[in-house]
Design a protein with these regions (language model features):
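Extended beta-strand-rich architecture
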Residues: 1-178
Length: 178
């Protein structure tokens, strides 16, 4: 299942990086084709893949810069699955079986005992080939996700008082008129 959707995303990251756009996050949804020994035609499976490199967000006055890493990418996947109603039975299992991936920074994603996909950092040799810095990718089988049993969605009322991420007060002496 590895890299059926991701090679195009890595090409796009490389294109952006060559033009000095260092902080990029992309995703792609589409069909992946598997050779089926029993049939002439390949089997089509709907997948979603993503690739992130650089900073997740720049430094601001109240937060330091946050580079993309394994745990951030894993969190994006967990959030996506949760938004789709899959909150139980997800586990991430470390693996070294994907040769294009960094052996110590890759995990297969399971729903109960069913393989959904993988997440991890691309192998340094592959990153060098694409002229990329640390890059994290994931690929998920959408058909298995759609077919998975979903938890009950719970409505949560929106607060009447919106949050304010920034509150600025200026103290100006009375002598200043303009």
């Amino acid at each position: 299942m590895l890299f059926r959707s991701l090679s195009g995303l890595l090409d796009d990251l490389s294109y952006n990086s060559a033009r000095k756009v260092e902080n990029v996050a992309l995703y792609e949804q589409g069909r992946v084709f598997f050779r089926d020994e029993d049939n002439e035609r390949p089997r089509e499976v709907e997948h979603v893949a993503g690739a992130l490199t650089g900073l997740f967000h720049e430094a601001t006055w109240n937060a330091s810069k946050k580079p993309v890493d394994f745990y951030l990418t894993k969190g994006i996947i967990t959030f996506l699955l949760s938004a789709l109603g899959i909150t139980r039975g997800i586990r991430f299992e470390a693996t070294a079986k994907h040769e294009e991936m960094h052996p110590g920074r890759t995990a297969d994603i399971y729903l109960n005992d069913q393989l959904l996909g993988f997440v991890g950092e691309i192998h340094p040799n592959l990153a060098k080939e694409y002229k990329l810095k640390r890059t994290y990718v994931f690929e998920l089988d959408l058909e298995k996700i759609i077919a998975a049993p979903k938890g009950e969605l719970v409505y949560q009322e929106i607060s009447k008082y919106p949050t304010i991420p920034r509150d600025v007060a200026l103290a100006v002496p009375n002598e200043i008129t303009n």
